[in-house]
Amino acid sequence: MIDFSFSIYDLEYFLLIFVRVSCFVYIAPYFGMNDTPARIRIGISFFTSILLYETLTPADAVVFDTVMEYAVIVMKEAIAGLLIGFGANICMAVVNFAGSIADMETGLSMATLLDPATKETTSITGVLYQYSFMLMLIASGMYRYLFGALADSFTLIPVNGVVFHADSLLQSMTEFMSDYILIGFRIVLPIFCVILLLNAILGVLAKVSPQLNMFAVGIQLKVLAGLTAMFLTTGMLPGAADFVYQEMKKMVVSFIGGMM
């Protein structure tokens, strides 16, 4: 006979799972976008928490005497979920950085666009790259890895078992930030090389024919050359996305390891 009993202790345990999951969904790539309806976020968090609750074995460590102690446990679970989602979301920020470099080189940085995902003013190419990488994140099934990592975190880090190691988390952030600029330049390296070659050609022409207004001509040629290079290198985006997703996996694993 199936037992459907549900006590107050089960509710407290379920709420702790829900807090970690909802905080992860709030900041995770694609699901944490501002234009994602709040009902969708809550629904995903709620049903994911139900599945995890039915799968996990309640830990005996969830013991507290006062409301303040329970509030501290809730806060720890919230921070754990935010850190796991932040580890994945920070890797997608590299895409916006790469788009800003491309626009700065091609001259499109003068034209900005309101990003509906973040409600911030950003570069046109940055928005294009961001949505391209988001679509590939869904098409490649990378979102399943993120939710799988979240589910595994409850095994590695039980509820009320979060222990923050500041040195490990700081080291993970430092290692990633050292590669942040390098990853961004790898994405836009073809465009950067084309514009660099064009600048060299314009510099030679300016010396050969000083009467020509190379500034006016160069602005138009940079935009045309940049868009052409961007179009020709579109086939390289899946490879760049795979590289970013590998970095995303490393960050999520390192952040989970910093809370064990």
Label every PLM stretch briefly.
Residues 1-260:
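Hydrophobic alpha-helical segments and their helix-loop boundaries in membrane
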